[in-house]
A protein has these predicted regions:
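Conserved Rossmann-fold dehydrogenase catalytic segment
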Residues: 20-26, 51-77, 84-87, 114-122
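NAD(P)-dependent Rossmann-like dehydrogenase/reductase catalytic/cofactor-binding core
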Residues: 73, 80-84, 109-209
Length: 209
């Protein structure tokens, strides 16, 4: 998205603000830390505008990694909701979160981003927040899918993000099994329990290869 804006606006002064920040808590002045990615001038201006004692702003030059992390946290939140809804246990939810970070890191690196960004506020921070709370729309949607319950909120960005991520993953030849599962989760004939079991039956491999 940031690349599209830069191209359309003919302006490199684009910033990406991301991080663990439920809107209501920001409104209520609860302590929050986020990251703004962009060129130095953009970081300095954004920090000047947004940084307060309650809202801490860190800087990053990694727009790609920050953007990918912000999109993928919604995908992994859906997966975490599915695991929670299927009552597969806390071990499974922790595994989904950790392997979700690995998938995000591979995607970010493949697109030219920095893997360390994925383990900062935009990635691990936001992913943890979104994957461990019913306040997260994406987590709640995944939970509702697993429970076969209706869910009216249409602001579940993770489904569309997962479909786009899989298209990119195929082009750059990386595996993203959790993301792929989420991308098919809206299929009425898709049995989530079976698909999670199949994912666990994949051949063993080294953690980071």
């Amino acid at each position: 998205m940031s690349n599209i804006l830069q191209e359309r606006l003919k302006n490199k002064k684009i910033g990406v603000l991301s991080g663990p920040s439920f809107a209501q808590e920001v409104i209520d002045y609860k302590p929050t830390a986020v990251v703004v990615a962009g060129e130095l001038e953009t970081i300095e201006k954004s920090t000047e505008l947004f940084h307060t004692p309650e809202f801490r702003v860190y800087g990053s030059n990694d727009i790609i990694g920050t953007s990918v992390s912000g999109a993928m946290k919604n995908v992994i939140a859906i997966a975490a909701g599915i695991v929670y809804g299927l009552e597969l246990g806390e071990n499974a939810r922790a595994a989904i979160l950790t392997r979700g970070l690995a998938e995000t890191a591979k995607l970010a690196k493949g697109l030219g981003g920095q893997t360390e960004t994925v383990f900062g506020l935009a990635g691990a921070g936001d992913m943890a927040l979104s994957s461990l709370s019913m306040t997260s729309r994406n987590f709640s949607w995944g939970f509702s899918l697993a429970k076969k319950q209706p869910f009216d909120d249409k602001l579940t960005e993770g489904l569309n993000s997962s479909k786009m991520a899989i298209k990119i993953a195929k082009k750059i030849k990386i595996e993203m099994p959790i993301t792929e599962l989420v991308s098919k989760a809206d299929n009425k004939n898709f049995d989530l329990q079976t698909e999670v079991e199949n994912m666990m039956k994949r051949p063993p491999k080294l953690e980071w290869f």
